[in-house]
Amino acid sequence: MSCDEGKLFVGGLSFDTDEQCLETVFSKYGQIQEVVVVKDRETKRSRGFGFVTFENCEDAKDAMAGMNGKTVDGRQIRVDQAGKSSNDRRGGYRGGSSGGGRGFFRGGRGRGGGGYGGSSRFDNRSGGGYGGWIPDYYSSGRESSYGDRSAGGRSYRDSYDSYG
């Protein structure tokens, strides 16, 4: 049975990278027990990360050293020991790398969030569409500072409309 250090996290994958590709790239470091590319449940599309588990811990360490920062399918990948975020001695390092991943995906959700509840909230007051989306996008997380500015934008727009 393999030890915990035999399982590697592989991040930054192209959405086109599959298990076969990862196995081909990592197999030169040793015998692989399992390869998993994590996919979205609904779309079945890659979420951009996966795991490679080696039979031998030393092979996994060699693969981590040899593959971290390399390019696979046009994307620079990150390779680290899986599950180390809960381990105190490497928690800071692991937290930093996963934090970058969260930042990337958070940006996508932020734009999606602006398109959902926020847009309809502004549509009722500002005439909606493009004008409603921009303030909602920028106000997410900073509602108080941008609330005044968007109100000012509406009063300017109202006075401009009165000329017509």
Swiss-Prot record:
One of its GO terms (cellular component) is nucleus. The keyword Ion transport does not apply. GO terms for molecular function: enzyme binding; mRNA 3'-UTR binding; mRNA binding; ribosome binding. The keyword Glycosyltransferase does not apply. Residues 155-164 have a biased composition (Basic and acidic residues). Residues 93-118 have a biased composition (Gly residues). Keywords: Cytoplasm, Developmental protein, Methylation, Nucleus, RNA-binding, Stress response. Methylated on arginine residues within RGG motifs. Methylation by prmt1 promotes cytoplasmic accumulation. Residues 6-84 form the RRM domain. The arginine, glycine rich domain, which contains a number of RGG motifs, is necessary to regulate nucleocytoplasmic localization. Cold-inducible mRNA binding protein. Acts cooperatively with elavl1/elrA to stabilize AU-rich element (ARE)-containing mRNAs by binding to them and inhibiting their deadenylation. Essential for embryonic gastrulation and neural development, acting to maintain the expression of a set of adhesion molecules, and cell movement during embryogenesis. Required for pronephros development. May play a role in hibernation. Interacts with prmt1. Interacts with elavl1/elrA (via RRM3). Associates with ribosomes. This is Cold-inducible RNA-binding protein. It comes from Aquarana catesbeiana (American bullfrog). The lineage of its organism: Eukaryota, Metazoa, Chordata, Craniata, Vertebrata. The gene is cirbp.
